[in-house]
Amino acid sequence: ENGVTYNVYADPSGSDRPWALDPLPLIIAPEEWAKVSTAVAQRAKLLNAMLADLYGDQTLLSEGLLPPSLVFGQHGYLWPCRGIKPIGGIWLHNYAVDLARSPDGQWWVIADRTQAPSGAGYALENRLVVSQVFPEMFRDLHVQHLADFFHDQQDGLAALAPVEGDEQPHIVLLTPGPYNETYFEHAYLSRYLGFPLVEGQDLTGRGETLYLKTLRGL
């Protein structure tokens, strides 16, 4: 009813399907979740440190901890970024993990999502739907709000934008387009965060400046 979809182009029944939501949540004890969140944060710091090294001193390669072919053989390695120092030393700005329970009840990370992790927009929409389906339960249980996460994301992106004085930074949400499997989330987050939703063809470079094409020009 809310129009939430996830595009599945390998599905012979169609190019998209409704987003499935079980209104009954998976219950995780606070103590258990504290361990999970701490471990995931530690993992994110490790991956950020690895990126900083691979685009910096490359100690992991020189000491034989990682084979150079594993790094340089990847098309995703950005050679122009070699030697740069990002603001705050943060290379990994968005990170997600796929979690699963092991047979003995422990949590396992089965996938790291570092390139374009999806799910934040769907999580927000899920939360809104559940709050409408179970309004009293949602209120009485003092469910933690997600708004702080998105506010931090807005502030974090704004802090990365080089501006002068009181000038507001120009931030956009880049999407491959409506045929991407998570395009709904791109459009949803664009509206929620207040960032224009753009495709690569909407941008153009002039010297060291990136411009957004609009009906009024650049």
What is the predicted function of each stretch?
Residues 1-218:
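Preference for protein termini
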